[in-house]
């Protein structure tokens, strides 16, 4: 079976990481022949494309017509789309087309339709469509980066990585600077993060070329920090900390809320600027004893790929149940209340 894997652009973000993992484990565990398709209509990140091309046949398209031609030329049996935009993914007659929603859309189409987390499937579709979660399988760390960046061994290190512009709660710079001023052993290590301060104990780590480098970065930290205004529909960056049995401080707000399913301990959640400052001041490193690693055990390659095969590769086209009566009206009311709540927390 030849399966095309299309997630749009190939970069260092979570969608491309997930696409790579699905393609890799589909071949390893399910015996499929993966073919990676990627959007080259905008600037291409050559190093990221090379990472895929080293393991899979990888082909660029610049428009829908080129993508359709590639699917025909490559004799694709199943067209898999990790979908990040609102418009529907096109159908390809004679080929099974399956759609995997990354965001909170509800537009069932294709021969199979699913979401990237149990929380998202419930929030977007009342649980009437399945979840095929992202794989959490980072490589083991080879060491850590503290010495390389001049961070003392005895320091308490808070780490963050993700999209450069996604540490975007408005009060984050002030909260971090206040905590650094009050605690002399506290350091911040920020990977691939837009600079907001020149404090001597804030270390900016540039984008790393491979997943091993990210694992080394996580190993350098005692606790993670996630402060994304929109929340997380899955939260791979959070999961990479949990996989090394390290806790993560997470904002309790956001439209998307799977991060709260991953981190369910109230002492590692914050709402306001003062909450975060207090959390940074009171945190003391201690062994996780497997507690945090257990949170991501369901996302190991084997169980995820069993679900992937069952939902996307097997059986006839799936039924498309409707949402419950009144579901969207109730969801919109909840979202309005959440926006008001989040606005209050950001200004408190």
Question: What are these model-derived regions, one by one?
Answer:
Residues 6-13, 20-67:
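N-terminal strand-loop element at the rim of the active site
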Residues 14, 284-336:
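A charged, aromatic-enriched C-terminal amphipathic alpha-helix characteristic of glycosyltransferases
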Residues 76, 216-233, 246:
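Acidic donor-binding loop of glycosyltransferase active sites
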Residues 104, 111-141:
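Donor nucleotide-sugar binding/catalytic pocket of nucleotide-sugar-dependent glycosyltransferases
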Residues 134-198, 204, 211:
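Conserved catalytic-core segment of nucleotide-activated headgroup transferases in glycan assembly
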Residues 215, 238-243, 257-258:
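Short alpha-helical segment that forms part of, or immediately flanks, the ligand-binding pocket
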Residues 247-252:
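Short hydrophobic beta-strand element within catalytic cores of glycosyltransferases
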Residues 263-274, 281-285:
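Conserved acidic donor-binding segment of nucleotide-sugar-dependent glycosyltransferases
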């Amino acid at each position: 079976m030849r399966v095309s894997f299309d997630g749009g652009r190939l970069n260092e973000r979570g969608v491309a990481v997930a696409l790579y993992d699905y393609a890799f484990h589909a071949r390893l565990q399910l015996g499929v022949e993966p073919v990676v398709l990627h959007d080259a209509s905008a600037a291409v990140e050559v190093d990221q494309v090379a990472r895929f091309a080293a393991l899979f046949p990888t082909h660029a398209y610049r428009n829908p017509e080129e993508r359709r031609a590639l699917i025909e030329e490559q004799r694709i049996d199943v067209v898999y789309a990790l979908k990040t935009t609102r418009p529907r993914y096109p159908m390809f007659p004679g080929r099974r087309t399956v759609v995997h929603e990354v965001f909170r859309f509800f537009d069932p189409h294709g021969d199979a339709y699913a979401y990237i987390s149990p929380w998202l499937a419930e929030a977007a579709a009342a649980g009437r469509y399945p979840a095929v979660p992202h794989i959490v399988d980072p490589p083991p760390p080879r060491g850590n980066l503290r010495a390389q960046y001049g961070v003392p061994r005895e320091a308490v290190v808070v780490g963050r990585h993700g999209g450069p512009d996604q540490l975007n709660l408005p009060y984050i710079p002030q909260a971090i600077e206040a905590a650094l001023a009050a605690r002399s052993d506290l350091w911040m290590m920020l990977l691939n993060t837009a600079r907001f301060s020149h404090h001597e104990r804030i270390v900016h780590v540039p984008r790393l070329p491979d997943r091993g480098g990210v694992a080394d970065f996580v190993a350098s930290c005692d606790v993670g920090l996630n402060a994304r205004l929109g929340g997380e529909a899955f939260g791979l960056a959070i999961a990479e900390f949990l996989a090394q049995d390290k806790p993560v401080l997470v904002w309790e707000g956001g439209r998307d809320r799977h991060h709260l399913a991953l981190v369910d301990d109230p002492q590692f959640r914050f709402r306001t600027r003062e909450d975060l400052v207090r959390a940074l001041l009171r945190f003391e490193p201690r062994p996780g004893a497997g507690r945090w690693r257990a949170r991501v055990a369901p996302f190991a390659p084997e169980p995820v790929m069993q679900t992937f095969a069952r939902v996307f590769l097997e059986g006839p086209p799936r039924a498309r149940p409707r949402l419950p009566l009144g579901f969207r009206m109730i969801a919109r009311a909840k979202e309005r209340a959440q926006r008001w709540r989040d606005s209050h927390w950001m200004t408190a």
